[in-house]
Design a protein with these regions (language model features):
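Boundary/entry segment of secreted carbohydrate-active catalytic domains
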Residues: 1-15
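C-terminal domain-boundary segment and adjacent tail
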Residues: 2, 25-27, 31, 97-98, ...
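Non-membrane alpha-helical structural segments and their capping/turn regions in soluble enzymes
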Residues: 82-87, 156, 187-190, 194
């Protein structure tokens, strides 16, 4: 039985650097979903400013990990018309290809809303779509454009969820853990994350990037 474990972190803030260091320590690859049009955007979380990074300066930082699109400006996709939706993701992918020298990119949905219209428009532009929808079971999605989330790193029951995953009897089981690196800083979760990654590693799951998973289980047509 194979158990595939993916880590998917959104927004591309300066705190990704610390998360990459933790992932490297535990030899776990991650997928980092970036917005190339928001480098100067600052917002507050828990009363502190969250700082984004200059993406063009992060090529070495993310080496050994995957970068994916999170749209250009992190808009709610269901509020965009068809052409704007294509541009938001297509332009972001073009920027990331130029900066990182990659050919294929996946996409992680900003916020939570992404319906059939959005999937049908975006599927020709990207290799896969990671949704923001939660799924209880660990079965593989029917296609690479409906990849769910199985837990956030700071969910109260995340340890139990991971343990349940380790006991799955499916021939191939999938667990996608998501989050934001700025939460590690603002909530002082660095030590917590270090221990959680060690717990994940103790099960000897097949930890891989989202693109590695998609290419391995969903051949191109």
């Amino acid at each position: 039985m194979r158990k595939i474990f993916l880590l998917s972190f959104d927004d591309g803030t300066i705190y990704d650097k610390g998360l990459v260091e933790l992932l490297n320590k535990h030899q776990i690859p991650g997928t980092f979903n970036l917005n190339s049009g928001l480098e100067d955007f600052v917002w507050e979380f828990e009363g502190r400013e969250v700082l984004r990074q200059c993406i063009s300066d992060t090529v070495e930082q993310y080496r050994g990990h995957e970068i994916a699109s999170h749209s250009l400006h992190h808009h709610l996709l269901t509020c965009l018309d068809d052409d704007t939706l294509r541009w938001e993701v297509g332009e972001d992918c073009a920027n990331l290809r130029r900066i990182f020298g990659v050919e294929e990119l996946g996409f992680a949905v900003p916020f939570t809303a992404c319906g059939d219209r959005e999937v049908s428009i975006l599927a020709p532009l990207v290799r896969y779509i990671r949704l923001s929808e939660f799924r209880e079971d660990f079965a593989l999605p029917a296609d690479p454009f409906h990849i769910p989330i199985h837990g956030l790193y700071n969910d109260p029951d995340i340890y139990n969820r991971i343990y349940d995953f380790s006991r799955s009897t499916l021939p191939v089981a999938l667990f996608v853990m998501a989050g934001h690196s700025y939460e590690l800083e603002m909530l002082n979760h660095w030590d917590y994350m270090d221990k959680l990654l060690g717990y994940i590693r103790s099960f000897h799951f097949e930890c891989m990037t989202t693109m590695e998973f998609v290419n391995g289980f969903y051949p191109k047509r």
